[in-house]
Design a protein with these regions (language model features):
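N-terminal pre-domain segments of enzymes
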Residues: 11-60
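Beta-propeller blade repeat segments, especially FG-GAP/WD-type strand-to-loop junctions
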Residues: 34-35, 45-46, 99-114, 151-166, ...
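Beta-propeller blade termini
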Residues: 75-85, 104, 127-137, 156, ...
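Asp-box/WD-like beta-propeller blade repeats and closely related beta-sheet repeat scaffolds
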Residues: 117-131, 146-185, 195-236, 241-243, ...
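Gly/Ser/Thr/Pro-enriched helix-cap/hinge segments flanking short amphipathic alpha-helices
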Residues: 11-12, 44, 52, 62-65, ...
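Short, conserved, GDST-rich strand-edge loop motifs in beta-rich repeat architectures
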Residues: 198-249, 366-392, 446-482
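Repeat-based blade/solenoid architectures
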Residues: 55-77, 96, 119-131, 169-181, ...
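Hydrophobic beta-strand segments that make up the repeating blades of beta-propeller
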Residues: 45, 88-95, 140-147, 191-197, ...
């Protein structure tokens, strides 16, 4: 007890080992969960820092580098999963300006840095995203890491938390790779990989760049960059010229890989009929978007993983509906009538319990009056498309899409109270108060508020009378203030209305949080949060819930050993809830593969529809228990 108290934790936070006594049934086993006895505990979270947890990692870059390489300001993520099979969820943090770090969960909210012996430091690269998944189907968690300029890397686990890099994995070791998601796109049983790519560099970081235009075929094109001909150079395909003459810098093509087994992937082509537009025509070139996030999700209820890709800047979001055999087509233009302008992250939940998944996409609209009125915001519509049914506005705010059940969505951000959450990155729908309705938690903040209209006005005024050398131009960017957004929380109440409860739920620390993941770090059956901070050490947020909960984990057939893509339905007197087991899909981050249900009655029925088409039904399910459901006995 003395040891626990010395850490600033309570006795009820002492290590709680994974259950050793299980009840078994046909295709399942279950064990009792022991919610902590926290007298006087309030709903929400308790923030824990490295002084008590042992997580001393810091994700930071120098001020000069943040000015010269603005893409690095997009931060880094975190991946959660049990890498050594001891029953405790471990954590892997990416560092944008230094080493990455793997921390072994010792229980009792204490973590040990095992990066060196695990051999996953990834020194010398600007690491962005991470994902822990069973890539090779041997029932341990392997590691995927992305970086700016370094693409994606794969490290295979030996089952004991020691990793070896797969140097011939087939993954591209270039491009500005960001977030990742995995799913079985072709029904062959293993997990395929999508990597959202941004850029490695941008001309925004190169003041004084000289672009020369010419007219080719009746349209303006960029002919040279700093005297270098675009055609045949690294600049080919990098720029477009808009209808009003503005020069647009393109992002990089994303990468979709087919899992070939044994830790090897094959890069799939965009232009061989794999991807088709709304009219079913094969794409003639890959989209050159500024990719930030990507998630697989069965959007239309046909049992196969569709895709939602969040793109920054002028790039539109991409929605791709799967045929189950690895081919994708854009939905009808009437499906989504608008989009967020600078989309950061996406998450899904059946908010109104009608059996169809709804979704939120995050942008950068401020919650408070002062910030909102200093932001430079605009609504973007494709020039020349006014009056056409295909025109889609790009809105500078969050968008919430409620499924109508027919493949189309109604935008409902203002109806739900969720149009603004600050400079937001990762949304996670989760039932924090365990009342049976998904609440929403969001990571926020940015190193430089480059949309601050007051600073922009000052700089424009100076530029009218002065000339600045490139180094001086970069230095002027230091005037943009930090946006210490911290964490945000919205509680879902009646009639789809969400209330901002950030302060009441323990999210009062001003900080820049970007990558965010959910996991059960103390084995009490609720979901805690892990936030990777920019310029600071990460924060852990212990969930303070004490009421009834139901935790579901899946044991799938190899090679999809975690049952990724399965739909889990829980039906009781509290109603019906449905969730999907996902892998990756967070901004630069990856949750532990587990699903939490609150508001469940004393007895429930759990139905699992596996990606293979099999089905498992477990009746008489009790609350305050964890259920492990096996696909091997499924029908």
């Amino acid at each position: 007890v003395l040891g626990v108290a010395a850490l600033g934790l309570c006795a009820e936070d002492a290590p709680r080992p994974w259950p050793s006594e299980w009840r078994s049934g046909a295709g399942w086993r279950s064990a009792t969960l022991e919610p902590p006895n926290r007298s006087g505990a309030t709903i929400g979270f308790t923030q824990l820092e490295g002084t008590s947890t042992g997580i001393t990692f810091t994700n930071a870059i120098s001020g000069e580098l943040s000015l010269r390489h603005s893409i690095l300001n997009n931060g880094s993520g975190v991946a959660a999963g049990d890498v050594d099979g001891d029953g405790w969820c471990d954590l892997y943090f990416c560092g944008i300006g230094g080493r990455n770090a793997l921390f072994r969960n010792q229980g009792g909210w204490r973590f040990q840095d095992i990066t060196a012996q695990a051999r996953v430091e990834c020194a010398g690269q600007a690491s962005t995203g991470a994902l822990l998944a069973d890539v090779d189907g041997d029932r341990d968690l392997d590691l995927l890491v992305t970086s700016v300029g370094g693409g994606a890397r794969l490290f295979l686990n030996d089952g004991k938390g020691r990793f070896s890099e797969m140097l011939d994995s087939g993954l591209l070791r270039k491009l500005g790779a960001m977030s990742m998601a995995m799913a079985d796109i072709d029904g062959d049983g293993d997990l395929d990989l999508y990597v959202a790519n941004y850029r490695t560099t941008t001309i925004q970081d190169e003041p004084g760049t000289r672009l020369v235009l010419s007219n080719e075929g009746g349209r303006p094109v960029v002919k040279t960059v700093n005297g270098v001909a675009v055609k045949g150079s690294e600049y080919e395909g990098r720029f477009d010229v808009g209808a009003s003459g503005e020069i647009l810098e393109n992002g990089e093509p994303d990468a979709l890989y087919r899992n070939e087994g044994n830790g090897r992937f094959a890069l799939l082509e965009w232009t061989n009929g794999l991807f088709r537009d709304e009219n079913g025509r094969p794409l003639d070139r890959p989209p050159l978007d500024w990719g930030l996030s990507v998630a697989f999700r069965d959007l239309n209820g046909d049992g196969v993983p569709d895709l939602y890709v969040c793109n920054d800047s002028d790039s539109p979001d991409r929605v791709w509906l799967s045929d189950g055999a690895g081919h994708y087509q854009a939905p009808d233009p009437m499906a989504f009538r608008c989009q967020s302008l600078s989309s950061m992250g996406v998450d899904f939940a059946d908010l109104n319990r009608d059996g169809f998944d709804d979704l939120i996409v995050l942008d950068m609209l401020a919650r408070d009056h002062r910030h909102r009125n200093t932001q430079l915001a605009w609504t973007k519509a494709p020039i020349g498309s006014f009056g056409t049914h295909a025109a889609r506005l790009q809105l500078p705010r969050n968008t919430v899409f409620m499924s109508r059940g027919d493949g189309t969505y109604a935008e409902a951000a203002y109806l739900t109270g969720l149009p603004a959450s600050d400079w937001s990155w990762t949304p996670i729908f989760m039932d924090v108060d365990l009342d049976g309705r998904e609440d929403l938690v969001i990571s926020n903040g940015f190193h430089r508020d480059v949309r601050d209209q007051d600073r922009l006005a000052e700089m424009r005024k100076e530029s009218a009378t002065q000339r600045f050398a490139p180094n001086q131009e970069l230095a002027r960017r230091a005037r943009f203030p930090e946006w210490m957004g911290g964490m945000a929380a919205f509680r879902q109440g009646a009639e789809l209305r969400f209330e901002d409860v950030s302060m009441g739920w323990g999210f009062g620390t001003p900080r820049i949080y970007q990558g965010l993941a959910a996991a059960d770090l103390d084995n009490d059956g609720d979901l805690d949060l892990i936030a990777n901070s920019f310029g600071n050490a990460p924060s852990l947020f212990r969930n303070n819930a004490v009421i009834g909960r139901l935790l579901v984990r899946l044991v799938g057939l190899a090679p999809n050993t975690e049952g990724i893509g399965a739909r889990i339905g829980v039906e009781s007197e509290g109603g019906r809830q449905v969730q999907e087991m996902m892998k990756g899909g967070r901004y630069l981050s990856c949750d532990q593969a587990t699903r939490l249900f609150g508001g469940v009655g004393e007895s429930a029925t759990v139905t699992v529809k596996w990606r293979t088409g099999r089905r498992t039904v477990v009746r008489g399910v009790l609350i305050n228990r964890v259920y492990e459901i096996r696909e091997a006995e499924a029908q």
